[in-house]
Amino acid sequence: MGFFITFEGIEGCGKTTQLRLLKERLVALGEKVTVTREPGGCPVADQMRAILLDAKNSAITPLAELLLYAAARAQHVQEVIVPALERGETVLCDRFTDATVAYQGHGRGLDLSVIEELNTLATGRVQPALTVLIDCPVEVGLSRALARIEATSGAKEERFERESLLFHQKVRDGYLALAAAFPERFVVVDGSGDVQQTGLLVEEALRRRMQSLGKAGLTEVKAGC
């Protein structure tokens, strides 16, 4: 079986950039890597992503939002993640089940036990071996996210960026609560700095954790590639 790593964090934390950099390092080391994301990652789930993230769809209720995420995840896990792991690849996923707990659970206030049941049903109990949480203050993350939207002439995928500071603080608190509850799976990295600074922190955190897990190849990752 392969090795499953997820990247999590609030809007604008820099997780997508750090995931891409890690992929480049691993490929340079000869690792077979599948990079994917949620919501989305395959054609059916990408259609649900378009609905979930389009700012025009502000009328989506919290429950409908939760169920759409679960449906997209069920398709994604079976079509992309499980086959890649069975091929022995390292899977890097931009958001996974923890995002649903943080956003729909802590952010929207939905029942965490219901979310846990849906996540289990959607994933078939597939879980990441390691989750990298890129953490930064809400104000920093949203400033970056809004700057990115302006730079792309108003991207459509901005429904969550339009939520209140309080919502995003609840999401951040939810992520930190998850990291505290599952320290054997999470590594928390300060994402307040620039890309290079955060990359160095990710590199060191991964090296320490991979050594403890006995994953030899991943202990060789170097930042700045």
From Swiss-Prot:
ATP binds at residues 9-16. SUPFAM superfamilies: P-loop containing nucleoside triphosphate hydrolases. InterPro entries: P-loop_NTPase, Thymidylate_kin-like_dom, Thymidylate_kinase. Pfam families: Thymidylate_kin (PF02223). Keywords: ATP-binding, Kinase, Nucleotide biosynthesis, Nucleotide-binding, Transferase. GO terms for cellular component: cytosol. It is an enzyme of class 2 (transferase). GO terms for molecular function: ATP binding; dTMP kinase activity. The keyword Glycosyltransferase does not apply. It comes from the Bacteria. It catalyses: dTMP + ATP = dTDP + ADP. One of its GO terms (biological process) is dTTP biosynthetic process. Its EC number is 2.7.4.9. PANTHER family: THYMIDYLATE KINASE (PTHR10344), UMP-CMP KINASE 2, MITOCHONDRIAL (PTHR10344:SF4). Phosphorylation of dTMP to form dTDP in both de novo and salvage pathways of dTTP synthesis. Belongs to the thymidylate kinase family. This is Thymidylate kinase. It comes from Geobacter sp. (strain M21).
